[in-house]
Amino acid sequence: MRDAPPLAPGIHLVHKPLGETSFSSVRAAMAELEAARPGKRVPVCHGGTLDPFAEGLLLLLVGQATRLMDLLHAVPKHYVAQVIWGTETDTGDLLGRVVHAGDPSALTPGALEAALAGFRGWQDQVPPATSAKKLGGEPAYRKAHRGEEVVLPPSRVYLHEARWRSHELPRSSQLELVCRGGFYVRSLARELGRILGCGAHLARLHRTAIGPWEDPGPGRRMGLHGRQVLPWSALRELSDAEVGELRRERPIALGRLLPPDWRLPPGFPDPEAPVRGFHLGRLVALLREQEGAFRMQMELRGGL
């Protein structure tokens, strides 16, 4: 991998190529860590699945950063998608089996914009049967691939922005969108096709950014540490004594907070993130306010 920094504990930005699973990037990282430090097991996970037919930014969480995974879903995710009109597939993408075909010849840009407008904001969305959502403790896609019937309950999701970038009607359109984690672009294409009466599925999907972090491009990796981690959260500098108090499960004064290093887009839902606690330039704790003081929500030993 070109220009790749060492896989130190922290968040690493990588480009997931077409055709690979998200977990293949995790396996590659684990192999690299094992080669660098034989016999020493370092936890690795990713910060949100990209399907094999999709490409773009994938977050690799290494070491203590794996504990931050749940804090990454509530920030903006940016996508560019190609929607194919006229056929719906059972997976919602070009890899699936066609389950419905319709005539898209009457589609117009105005009709597409009117259909898209109804999906902005909060909504209940049924995930694809081939999603990574758990059903009975098992990812739904495994059941679907075995031929089992998969009926997933709707999830509450949020679409912040969506606009059509271009059209090649009646065949396809290109869509750009910003959403919260948990939103399925495949499901959006499926529902648009049903509303418009012709069927639709995704041919391409590119995740271009998550929060302030952009896709580094093929073959590149970028490591995030210190104030680059969770930059949408406020910051509190901690003294040696305060770190000791927090580790003993004692409260510390609220003190002086520094503002986030990155601001969410106007109107985007507040992720209600904990305050970052820094000591000697490293992120060592996540703090929660309780009864007029800060307490330890999560300790990040060694720091990030």
List the predicted regions and their residue ranges.
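Residue-level signal for inorganic ion chemistry
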Residues: 60, 81, 137, 188, ...
